[in-house]
UniProtKB/Swiss-Prot annotation:
Part of the 50S ribosomal subunit. Its main location: plastid. Belongs to the universal ribosomal protein uL16 family. Gene3D superfamilies: Ribosomal protein L10e/L16. GO terms for cellular component: chloroplast; mitochondrial large ribosomal subunit. It comes from the Eukaryota. Pfam families: Ribosomal_L16. GO terms for biological process: mitochondrial translation. It is found in: Plastid, Chloroplast. GO terms for molecular function: rRNA binding; structural constituent of ribosome. This is Large ribosomal subunit protein uL16c. Disulfide bonds: none annotated. Keywords: Chloroplast, Plastid, Ribonucleoprotein, Ribosomal protein. It comes from Chlamydomonas sp. (strain WXM).
């Protein structure tokens, strides 16, 4: 699963999911893409689940790009711990996704295969998504 090698701070603030994606909202590498329609946190496990579906579906013919990276640590306290005594330890990693952000890109397969693969990968995502094709 994806995670940063090192970060400047171990425990980041949660932040807000306001506004739309201003960067990473156009197709750059491939011909087909899966775009987020809602704001959310996508965990490294969910990104990996989507990647597995797409690589299995397209086999050797296609090329896949993952356009998001989980660089934010989410902390959790142990179950049954009393209030206080500081913030919990980092538990898992998430990618902060705003509406319009491209999640995956694909190339080297037909549109029908790409559409089916992206639809299955969309089931693994915790957010509504949209299938995009590159405008010539």
């Amino acid at each position: 699963m994806l995670s940063p090698k090192r970060t400047k701070f171990r425990k980041p603030h949660r932040g807000h999911l306001r506004g739309k994606a201003t960067r990473g909202n156009t197709i750059v590498f491939g011909d087909f893409a899966l775009q987020a329609q809602e704001p959310c946190w996508i965990t490294s496990r969910q990104i990996e689940a989507g990647r597995r579906v797409l690589t299995r579906y397209v086999r050797r013919g296609g090329k896949l790009w993952i356009r998001i990276f989980p660089d934010k640590a989410v902390t959790m306290r142990p179950a049954g711990t009393r209030m206080g005594s500081g913030k919990g330890a980092p538990d898992y990693w998430v990618a902060v996704v705003h509406p319009g952000k491209i999640l995956y890109e694909m190339q080297g397969v037909s549109e029908t295969i790409a559409r089916q693969a992206m639809r299955i990968a969309a089931y693994k995502m915790p957010v509504k998504t949209k299938f995009l094709t590159k405008q010539a």
